[in-house]
Structure formats: C-alpha cells, structure tokens
C-alpha cells in the first residue's frame, strides 16, 4: 500500500530554495520513505502535534501530515527550523 505525496505551496517554495543535492535527497526520501512508511518519521509535539518530521540535512527538515483515509502524505515545509 503506497501513499500519494502532495506539497503545499509553501513546501514548493522551500524546495526551490534547496541546493540541487538536497532536492535529490528530498526526492529519494519522498519516494522511498514517505510514500511507503510515512509513520517512520518523528512525531512532533506541542503546537505541531499531529505532524511528523524527517531530517533532510543537519538543519533542514521535511514536515508533513498523514491522511490515512485518503492514503495521502501532505508535505507542509521542507526547510530549516533554525530561523529560516
């Protein structure tokens, strides 16, 4: 069972700002991890409870939500959480 992966406008903007190397890494993570095992990411806490995160680089993260009823992963952000 494979999930579809969609991106918010903000995530698309974030991806455009990534280096080509990180964009390639993001594609691999989406294809091999989020679409297949979306719950393998870290469950977030606090105001982001209900969302998940996967490390893209030392400072960059992919933040997403999972919609089981639609077999959908919605990527919200793909950028740093350190002031960027």
Annotate each language-model stretch with its function.
Residues 2-13, 17, 21-24, 54-61, ...:
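Enriched for short, Lys/Arg-rich terminal
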Residues 23-33:
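Compact soluble domain cores
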Residues 29, 43, 69-71:
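N-terminal functional modules and adjacent low-complexity/disordered segments of proteins
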Residues 31-56:
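A short, surface-exposed loop/turn module that caps and links secondary-structure elements
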């Amino acid at each position: 069972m494979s999930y579809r992966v969609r991106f918010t406008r903000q995530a698309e903007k974030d991806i455009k700002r990534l280096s080509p190397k990180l964009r390639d890494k993001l594609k691999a993570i989406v294809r091999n991890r989020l679409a297949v095992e979306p719950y393998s990411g870290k469950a977030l806490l606090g105001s982001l409870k209900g969302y998940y995160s996967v490390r893209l680089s030392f400072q960059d993260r992919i933040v997403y939500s999972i919609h089981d009823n639609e077999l959908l992963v919605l990527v919200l952000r793909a950028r740093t959480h350190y002031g960027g």
